[in-house]
Amino acid sequence: MGKLIRMGAQERRSLWPKRLHWSRPLFLLGMLIIGSTYQYLTSPQGLPTLWAAVSSQHPVKVASRDLSNKEMMMVSSETSKSSSEMEVEAWAPEATAGRDGTPPGIARKNTPSTPRGTASITPAIPNNYSPTPTGTGKVKEDTSATPSGVLNHYTQSRPMVNSYTRLTARGEVKSSRPTQSRGKEEKYSPSPLGRMVNSYAPSTLMTMPRSHGITPRTTVKDREIMATKKMLATNPSKRLVEKTTPTPLKGITDNTPTFLLSDLETDTLTSPRNVVEKKTLTTPRRVDSNSSTNHQGLVGKNNLTTPQGMVLEHTAAVSEGQVTISTMTRSSPTETKASTDAWKVRNPLPRTSAPIIRISSATFRGLLKNPSKAPSTPAAPRVRANPTIQVRHCLVVEPAPVAPTAPSPSWTTAVIPGIPSPSGQPDLYPKAEYPRDLFSVEERRQGWVVLHIFGMMYVFVALAIVCDEYFVPALGVITDKLQISEDVAGATFMAAGGSAPELFTSLIGVFISHSNVGIGTIVGSAVFNILFVIGTCALFSREILNLTWWPLFRDITFYIFDLMMLILFFLDSLIAWWESVLLLLAYAFYVFTMKWNQQLELWVKEQLNKRPVAKVMALGDLSKPGDGTVVVDEQQDNKKLKLSSMLTRGSSSASLHNSTIRSTIYQLMLHSLDPLGEARPSKDKEEETLIPEAKATPQAKAESKPEEEPAKLPEVTVTPAPAPDVKGDQEEDPGSQGVGAEAENTGERTGGEAEAPAEGENGERSGGDAALGGESEGKAENESEGDIPAERRGDDEDEGEIQAEGGEVKGDEDEGEIQAGEGGEVEGDEDEGEIQAGEGGEVEGDEDEGEIQAGEAGEVEGDEDEGEIQAGEGGEVEGDEDEGEIQAGEAGEVEGDEDEGEIQAGEGGEVKGDEGEIQAGEAGEVEGEDGEVEGGEDEGEIQAGEGGEGETGEQELNAEIQGEAKDDEEGVDGEGGGDGGDSEDEEEEDEEEEDEEEEEEEEEEEEEENEQPLSLEWPETRRKQAIYLFLLPIVFPLWLTVPDVRRLEAKKFFVITFLGSILWIAMFSYLMVWWAHQVGETIGISEEIMGLTILAAGTSIPDLITSVIVARKGLGDMAVSSSVGSNIFDITVGLPLPWMLFSLINGLQPVAVSSNGLFCAIVLLFLMLLFVISSIALCKWRMNKILGFTMFLLYFVFLIISVMLEDRIISCPVSV
């Protein structure tokens, strides 16, 4: 409990008590005030006597809780004289008898010997009442010998606040709202245990009510308490709070109802009614007493749930009760009853109605007026408490300084009600522990809240940068070190990298803000991912999304199972430790399944394949390895090994964070002008984007063949694969390559990697995107502008490709493609390439990164670093090209030294060029060195017709001789195609292989780009410089404090990067939740709603941007599967992990998670998930724009319904 809350009037009203540490000065000041008040009160006639009597029996301890407890300071007035026995200070009252279960509060019952005229006030304090201090510390058990030890020991731990609140004007008391705790009556229902907290009301007499927190008749989540201790009813005291005006001593206590005794106790709050009025905390001390299940806050705080600030206000009511405590000489059953009744009336929470109040001291003749504001004030009256005796001497104790106690936590996080909370429990739930804001609520409402909104949005960007630039790369290094498979890594480490903000938000919600902000954020983020992200991907993709059914089906199956568990656990609004463990085990099961994902996938598909329907599903995606057909041959398996997890989305857990395709937010903001636009490579993207094209069915490819001359060895244009794979491919493909002349039919990309680097440093360009067939994506940004359209063959090859029939090609290509047709012989020096030779072909080569494809009897000699040489029938290719593709047709001869170009030559053509693309028709000769094509581009296209000769030194070569070039080339392609294809089946297989290899190549290039370490280099353009300065406050501290493991020299510090990233994420998450809380407080919406809406969207927007970019590249299913996969981590780790930690720290106590609308929101999420999977399945695993738009709208419908549920505008039909 070591936290005190300052109850200053202003702060009380704001309902947001501030934490303060009690200081000696305040304590001394309070003591002085109490002492002076006591002196003043002792002057009246019988008080000294009464006091003397009381003190003789039980020396009064000032503030049994003693300020130390913060609970209350008891004023011990020394006047022994005041005879008024009234001073019963029986704290015990209210819950006396029935208290047993509740946390003991200190009931200090000073039983006064009844003073002279006063009927003996027998405080109902039980003799054996032994308060157990829970919250505050010292409980004074003071079992008073007083007669009628009615309160047989109160177990309550409430500290006895002996504070005698002076009953100043009863009006004041009135002002204090009794409702506070137990009653909250008025407003705050929870007043568990110690509603007396509120009872600050001055107790006219010395009554020191000891508010037992026990009875929270008010709801308060202490349901347990309530149930058990109905007796607590006596607690009413708080409620009682009546105003007992008894500032006047003697008779003034006019309204001290008999029940007053109990009231008294409940009021025990020493804080004077003033305090109450002020809404001062006073209650806090009570709180301690309340500590029993009731969270101390409760009392002091006025119920756990109730905002702490409220407590104060409510406390007032409580105090009144205590005031009433006039010592009643005896607690006759009748009186007791009356008191109790009255009390009840005031505090309607009858359930606690334990009669305990036996202290019905009729104390003052005047009934307590006790208008308890507490709700249900039903008159309860002015029960005159049969004042057996009027205690003339009301000992009015000056209100002790309010000792703030820790605010009670919101009930949501409270521990289970039936279980008595440990004495320290109240501290577990202090109300939102946020630093004090520089601006007050009024100032924020005047416009300063804009700063909080900006800060919250800025932190969203900071979280994305930390995760993408440091945390995810560090996790990647860890998975490499542990040699974890891609599937398992994607489901564990990479999922954690993407969901780290949500996890930390959940931790902050449980341990710091004590609210449901974490649950709201995770549920809101889940709906955002399922509806908004997937819907947006469908809307913005260039074509209808063809989804891979297996990963989506697998992840949604697990997700539905996990959500059903969560809904069941939410039914009782409590999460027990074993429920948290079950959710964590569900995640472990998911990871285990991912370990055997491929085997499971094959088994499921085999089972489905036995039925016609299954085939439709299985054939749903041809683009993914292993997904295209039920039977996955070795070839596919080998490819899977080659491909990185990102592109094998179908067979691995979908995690954008695990994919090199993902561009970080920092890179997007600084280096991409059009993040949502297609990467440069897809310039001509009318054709299918690289992946979609891959997805195209073999039939489509077959159709395209006839059109495009290439008998298409459709994929003969396999992009260079890593060297190790070269030989294997050679062996596999020899028969299928017969089509040497073919050049890229079907718009496949070739020349991949090789051209990409040469063509530009365009990060977006997926490596080697030059599509040989219809689409050349290989052009660099620079090149694209100076591109001269090729007019041949319908311009299937925009970017130069060299095709020569019967020609001879000599070149040294670093990054080119050499394809040789039948009769060709290939001899090359390639380090990283693939050599594919057709029938009768001879291949000898050392490829760097290129592919040599030779047709039957073809001969190719070349020294390629990264290229492909394609030669037509009888062609000989010898090239020295740096970055180009040489395609030679029959009888063609090409000699060139190209740095960044492609040479295309027709029959009998000779081409020599240094930089550019040369396309020559029959008999055409073009020689150029350092030639620039239109626009002065380094990478241009030169097209020459028959008989044309063009030579250029360093000037533009723009020669277009279009005689028969087009026809000839088409003819050549046709021949090549005829020779090349042995069968459609072989071609289809080749296409699939080549597609995969192309994807891999592109991925590698992008990976290289994305793996670039964070650079603080000053950008060139003004716009980028502005963005750079905007991000510098985030990036610079990260750069200084966290090693970038993407740098080779820093890779060994991956542990520091991992831990440092976690610290930064935790800090940014805290700022995000804090500022969101301030914004919500200003606008008037709860943290739960902020989590469902703003925080959920903010933490998921980086993934949204990445998903849309990936979807536009054709990897739509990857984006969709990733959205569902990340949600599994949130539900099975993000939620249960903080709950489990909380339970372990607090003795395996359950965590309260009740909320007006969260349960219904989870049910809505479940229904939306069923809708999404069923609608996609009905659409045959394709997502059109109409379905995407529908999901987009459903997201907003969900938000509106959730907010209305949380604000109780509508009620949840399935609430529990």
From Swiss-Prot:
Sequence repeats lie at residues 796-811, 812-828, 829-845, 846-862, 863-879, 880-896, 897-913, 914-928. GO terms for molecular function: calcium channel activity; calcium, potassium:sodium antiporter activity; symporter activity. Residues 702-712 have a biased composition (Basic and acidic residues). Residues 796-928 are annotated as: 8 X 17 AA tandem repeats of D-E-D-E-G-E-I-Q-A-G-E-[GA]-G-E-V-[EK]-G. Glycans are attached at N290, N303. Residues 468-491, 540-557, 601-1024, 1074-1088, 1149-1157, 1207-1216 are cytoplasmic. This is Sodium/potassium/calcium exchanger 1. It comes from Bos taurus.
